[in-house]
């Protein structure tokens, strides 16, 4: 029989730790899917003049706004996030060092567009080149790094496309390391947000460069091109602009322990880019919150066990579960625990026995697995016989 038990009602939607009993032992580790509001579901009533836009919660991966977020578009200099990712990977694995000097080829020196102004036939430290890429959006710095890592920019592009596949960026394809206009070079807002999230997660030690407001190299001081970094609203990542793609930006900010990633593209002016990205960021903090449903090991419910050495088994959380939700959902959301009852022994700690369901009017249904919190061996033959007789006599 399937048991459904309401766990809490909308006005009381609080972190579920208040409703759960903590067990001293955690369940056996099982693969549990990540939890968040389905990414295709629009969560809030807001529009934007950006042709493409996506707003993502960094912690849960929930998408609060999706406007053509999966539509292919020119990424412009937001491409440089992938260049940075590969450079950081080489630093983290010891294949490159921050103090290492890299040679400047004529091709790098001649590169057009935004520049760091690397010296022809000279050499530049890797750390300076990183700042040149992130702060100054230097196309020349990208070429120096690409040639040092892969021997040529063409070889580096192969690494970029391979890394895109590895990271699950299913709608990204690169032809260069800089974002220089090329009709075949494409990304989506979703892929850019995913890449930004991975950059911050995988390389927190290098994310600090994004927050630098100015950088001076070769006697030339340049401002960080990210307007939200300049205003102290965001702490990274990257702007972009081409004639085809318009003005774009991927930015991230953290407030009170909650980080948000905003991607916009296809705007007409730098002012629109700054205004829209700031407006969407403020909206995401004003209208949404992260709620802790339960933590790994919390007991959510108890299920009766048939033919087991214990009469009940705890249904526990397999991981810490947070969801991103509009603040208005507190009035309509409800949580229900669903599980078959009785559960037939034997039960192994970590078995998936049920699920917690978040639902309600205007609330996308979200399901979270619940696991067995303990082993419950099967009774021996005499015990099973006694249980069958008892059930026949008492009907329970």
Segments from the language model and where they lie:
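N-terminal secretory signal peptides and thylakoid transit peptides that target proteins
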Residues: 1-12
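Sec/Tat signal peptide C-region and signal peptidase I cleavage site
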Residues: 16-20
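Domain-terminus/edge residues, biased toward the C-terminal soluble/receptor-binding domains
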Residues: 170-173, 181-396
């Amino acid at each position: 029989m399937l048991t459904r038990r309401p766990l809490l009602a909308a006005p009381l939607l609080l972190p579920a730790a208040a409703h759960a009993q903590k067990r001293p032992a955690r369940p056996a580790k099982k693969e549990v899917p990540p939890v968040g509001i389905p990414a295709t579901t629009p969560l809030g009533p807001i529009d934007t003049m950006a042709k493409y836009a996506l707003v993502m919660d960094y912690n849960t991966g929930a998408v609060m706004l999706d406007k053509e977020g999966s539509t292919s578009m020119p990424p412009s200099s937001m491409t440089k996030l992938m260049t940075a990712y590969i450079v950081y990977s080489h630093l983290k694995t010891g294949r490159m060092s921050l103090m290492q000097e890299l040679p400047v080829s004529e091709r790098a020196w001649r590169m057009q567009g935004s520049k760091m102004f690397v010296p022809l036939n000279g050499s530049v430290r890797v750390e300076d080149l990183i700042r040149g890429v992130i702060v100054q959006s230097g196309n020349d710095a990208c070429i120096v790094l690409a040639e040092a890592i892969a021997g040529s920019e063409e070889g580096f592009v192969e690494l970029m496309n391979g890394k895109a596949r590895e990271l699950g960026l299913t709608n990204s394809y690169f032809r260069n390391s800089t974002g220089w206009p090329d009709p075949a070079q494409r990304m989506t807002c979703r892929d850019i947000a995913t890449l930004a999230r991975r950059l911050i997660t995988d390389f927190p030690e290098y994310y600090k460069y994004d927050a630098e407001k100015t950088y001076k190299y070769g006697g030339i001081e340049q401002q960080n091109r990210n307007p939200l970094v300049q205003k102290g609203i965001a702490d990274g990542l990257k702007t972009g602009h081409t004639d085809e793609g318009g003005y774009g930006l991927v930015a991230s900010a953290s407030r009170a322990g909650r980080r948000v990633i905003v991607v916009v593209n296809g705007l007409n002016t730098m002012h629109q880019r700054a205004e829209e990205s700031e407006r969407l960021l403020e909206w995401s903090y004003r209208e949404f919150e992260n709620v802790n449903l339960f933590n790994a090991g919390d007991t959510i419910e108890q299920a009766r066990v048939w033919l087991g050495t214990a009469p009940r088994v705890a249904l526990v959380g397999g991981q810490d579960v947070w969801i991103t939700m509009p603040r208005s959902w507190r009035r309509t959301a409800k949580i229900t625990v669903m599980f078959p009852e009785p559960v037939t022994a034997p039960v192994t700690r970590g078995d998936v026995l049920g699920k917690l369901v978040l639902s309600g009017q205007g609330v996308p249904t979200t399901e979270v697995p619940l696991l067995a919190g303990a082993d419950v061996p099967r009774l021996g033959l005499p015990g099973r016989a006694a249980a069958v007789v008892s059930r026949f006599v008492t009907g329970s």
